[in-house]
Regions:
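Sec-dependent N-terminal signal peptides
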Residues: 4-14
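Formylglycine-dependent sulfatase
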Residues: 2, 18-272
Length: 272
């Protein structure tokens, strides 16, 4: 009887320890991605995403709450409908309306996880300068904190082409938004750029490199971690190293037949 009791006690202790072991979470956000990955269709080669889909759960009836960055991300990161958050534009702050709302990353932080983030998770116009400071255990890594390829340097706005760099060089004191407005006004805002440069010459490559370094650092912590990684593509403009463009034959890209503005869509949803 004593042996049975001891065995049961040991099993209970082991079960308790296992129950307390939390998983580490890598949360990846992608901007403006249509369901054209290999898990849904063979339209374009997406081997990395296909591997993730094969190992996990693929949703076949998932819908975006709103096709605008601010409302969509506010909804995803709070678990609330846009009609509840009342974030319908690209300027209203989430906490200006809901000061005590609990975000996804904040919930994990409140429950013992170490939370960190890089890139575009919240729309920056919907949160404070710290990308909703209370959601993170450490300072959030904004795009301007990233390390870019040493040879190319960081992109000007989104670009590395000489025309865009020339316009931006005229006013070196201008911030990111001012530079982009100037590029747009001077027709130096191309929809596509395909230069023969390394991944980390552009934002998403630099974001990925930072995420890899963060994973290695966070793995050494005693706490479980939640790392949020927000990629900016395939949102316009379509800028990426040439090697990725070379994977696809332009002749195989089908233009969607419907080219009109959807009824009720805000103007800035189609300004690109």
């Amino acid at each position: 009887m004593k042996k049975i009791f001891t065995l049961n006690l040991c099993l209970a202790v082991v079960a308790s320890l296992l129950a307390k072991e939390e998983p580490n979470i890598l949360f990846i956000a992608i901007d403006d991605l249509k369901p054209t990955i290999g898990a849904y269709t063979k339209a374009v080669p997406t081997p990395a995403m296909d591997r993730i889909a094969a190992r996990g759960t693929t949703f076949l009836n998932a819908h975006c709450q709103q096709a605008v960055c601010g409302p969509s991300r506010a909804s995803a990161m709070t678990g609330k409908y846009p009609d509840f958050t009342r974030i319908w534009d690209l300027k209203t702050k989430i906490r200006a309306i809901h000061p005590e709302i609990i975000t996804l990353t904040q919930h994990f932080k409140n429950n013992g996880f170490y939370t960190a983030g890089v890139g575009k998770i919240f729309d920056p116009r919907s949160v404070d300068k710290g990308a909703d400071t209370r959601s993170w255990s450490e300072a959030y890594t904004q795009t301007w904190h990233l390390k870019y390829n040493k040879k190319t340097g960081k992109p000007i706005g989104h670009y590395h082409n000489l025309k865009s760099k020339a316009f931006a060089a005229e006013d070196k004191s201008a911030n990111w938004n001012a530079i982009n407005k100037k590029l747009f006004a001077n027709n130096a805002w191309p929809a596509v750029e395909a230069l023969d440069v390394p991944d980390d010459a552009y934002d998403d490559g630099a974001i990925a490199a930072h995420a890899v370094r963060s994973l290695a650092k966070l793995a050494k912590k005693k706490k479980p971690f939640f790392l949020a990684v927000g990629f900016k593509k395939p949102h316009l403009p379509f800028v990426a190293p040439k090697k990725y463009w070379d994977l696809i034959d332009p002749k195989n890209i089908r233009l969607e037949p419907y080219q009109k503005k959807p009824q009720g869509a805000p103007n800035y949803a189609i300004h690109d």
